[in-house]
Design a protein with these regions (language model features):
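Catalytic-core "active-site belt" of small-molecule-metabolizing enzymes
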Residues: 5-235, 272-283
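Short strand-turn-strand beta-turns centered on an Asx-Gly dipeptide
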Residues: 201-203, 246, 266
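Short, charged beta-turn/beta-strand-edge "cap" motif at the junction between a beta-strand
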Residues: 249-253, 267-272
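Short, compositionally biased
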Residues: 257-268, 280-283
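Active-site lining segments that contact anionic ligands and/or coordinate catalytic metals
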Residues: 168, 240, 260
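A conserved acidic, glycine/proline-rich C-terminal tail/linker
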Residues: 221-256
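Short glycine/proline-enriched turns and hinge-like loops at secondary-structure junctions
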Residues: 190-191, 255-257
Length: 283
């Protein structure tokens, strides 16, 4: 692990972020804060350390803005990443129906993002290939990340999104599909890139997406993240058991308490009939 960079602005930025999260209020930052990407990630890592010391625990990572089709809408033109927390994660038991309940309490302007989620059986080797990465994946699942922002109207810069926890709010992970270590890499890569998804709100079709929307496929998005994480000063190393989201297959849609959203999924290859649609109710 590299040493986390220090900067005189970090303590004040961390304090602002803590207040915004705990009080669900906007951040009082001008467009020039943080000053750059390294400072934004250093701030996010300082928040991670402080929140861990307070008793929460990181369980993995979210990768955002991998969907090139939405870059112009948000003014962010490249992927970012943030931490997923034990307190923000809901996993559906394999014995239960593939439907979960998420509380929106404490979130600011929440939106729903249907995603592909991976769980690691081991840390992939440094500078891994796609095949080595697939061998390190224990399971794949469909999930929803509920993103939110402390910048009113979803108006922020890329560096502000990074500092603001990568916009992570909640994560619902549906039934997992186990991947044997001998899974054929190209078959999985192609199946996920070709995945088709329909997103419904209270029974009404809202959007449609493709696996290929996220950097040409979820495995490709995961590979990009693995390399970016290693290149970030002070970032933690990946561990067995980490889960990683790979970005929304559709646009991010506003949600509110009382709604029920669900997806329909069409997948081929090793995921045919295994990766299923997911429902969520909001409170």
């Amino acid at each position: 692990m590299n040493n986390t960079p220090s900067h005189p602005d970090i303590p004040a930025l961390v304090a602002d972020l803590a207040r915004a999260r705990l009080e669900a209020r906007p951040l009082p930052w001008p467009a020039t804060v943080p000053a750059d990407v390294p400072l934004a990630y250093a701030t996010a890592l300082a928040v991670r350390a402080a929140r861990s010391e307070q008793g929460d625990a990181p369980v993995g990572y979210k990768v955002g803005f991998t969907n090139r089709t939405i870059w112009p809408r948000y003014g962010v033109y490249g992927p970012i990443w943030g931490t997923v927390w034990r307190s923000s994660l809901v996993q559906i038991d394999a014995a239960a129906s593939n439907e979960g309940v998420i509380s929106l309490k404490g979130l600011c302007e929440p939106r729903i993002e249907p995603e592909v989620v991976f769980g690691l059986r081991e840390a992939p080797p440094p500078d891994c290939t796609a095949a080595q990465l697939v061998a390190a994946i224990a399971w794949v699942a469909h999930g929803y990340e509920i993103v939110h922002t402390h910048f009113p109207g979803w108006k922020f810069s890329a560096v502000q999104a990074v500092a603001d926890g990568g916009l992570h709010g909640r994560l619902l992970v549906g039934h997992t599909v186990a991947l044997p270590a001998a899974t054929e890499p190209e078959a999985l890569i192609d199946a996920l890139a070709g995945l088709r998804l329909k997103l419904y709100a209270d029974g009404v079709l809202k959007d449609q997406g493709l696996g290929a929307n996220v950097l040409d496929g979820p495995v490709q998005a995961l590979l990009h993240f693995v390399r970016e994480l290693r290149a970030t000063p002070g970032a933690p190393a990946l561990r067995a058991g980490d889960l990683i989201t790979t970005g929304t297959l559709t646009d991010a849609w506003p949600v509110q308490a009382g709604q029920r959203w669900h997806t329909e999924i069409a997948a081929a290859g090793p995921l045919a009939g295994a990766l299923k649609g997911l429902a969520v109710r909001f409170e």
